[in-house]
Design a protein with these regions (language model features):
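N-terminal [4Fe-4S]-dependent radical SAM core
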Residues: 51-131, 138-148
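Core AdoMet radical
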Residues: 136-155, 162-203
Length: 203
């Protein structure tokens, strides 16, 4: 099985983790790549389901050699490939002057992508006729894993730290829909301008 086949299999069937304590933490439910963990196969890092029902039934498991610190991917006890897990980013240990943890403002996706939902509420969410069927934007907020509104200053501060401490190379910004006039375009633009004024980071 080549590297691309391994990645396709993992993303389709998930990965059964014997221990959750490997690599950066994943999260159950909510917006973004929830129920997943970042996994590196060869030179490619992808998000793989680990907390889903399918992953619990997956034939793929990880075995970790605690003496060497390396991991291998197994299928029916046969070694398929060496794999690794990106570690918890350093910027997760920081907080703003107001005491907000950086991870409530933006998260690391994969190994080098910073992601944030600028406005965590949406006027469409509570109406089944207008809500996006895939969206779980309010779940993260209800679970206390994020803040409702990220300010331009907060986002610039976190982005600078993520680049400096963890080598983040680009950023994704999404938002809930706050109104029917510009749908949040002006505010997300203000946030993007604050970030690029502080750090050179493709958004």
């Amino acid at each position: 099985m080549n590297q691309q086949q391994v990645i396709t299999e993992l993303q389709s069937r998930g990965l059964k983790l014997v221990s959750d304590g490997v690599g950066a933490s994943g999260r159950k439910g909510g917006a973004g790549p929830s129920d997943h963990k970042a996994v590196t196969v060869g030179d490619t890092t992808v998000m793989v389901p680990v907390f889903t029902e399918g992953a619990a039934q997956s034939p793929y498991v990880v075995e970790r050699d605690h003496t060497t610190g390396t991991s291998v991917l197994l299928k029916e006890k046969e070694i398929i490939a060496p794999i690794s897990f990106p570690t918890q980013p350093k910027f997760y240990g920081l907080e703003t002057a107001e005491g907000i943890p950086y991870w409530k403002i933006a998260l690391l996706h994969s190994r080098n992508v910073l992601a944030t939902t600028v406005l965590q509420n949406c006027i469409r969410y509570d109406n089944r006729k207008t809500a996006c069927q895939f969206c779980a934007i309010s779940q993260s907020l209800e679970a206390g894993r994020t803040s409702a509104k990220k300010t331009p200053e907060q986002l610039a501060e976190v982005a600078e730290a993520a680049v400096r401490l963890d080598g983040v190379e680009h950023m994704i910004m999404t938002t809930g829909t706050p109104n029917v006039t510009d749908r949040g375009a002006a505010y997300i633009t203000e946030c993007a301008q604050a970030i690029t004024a502080r750090i050179s980071l493709p958004i």
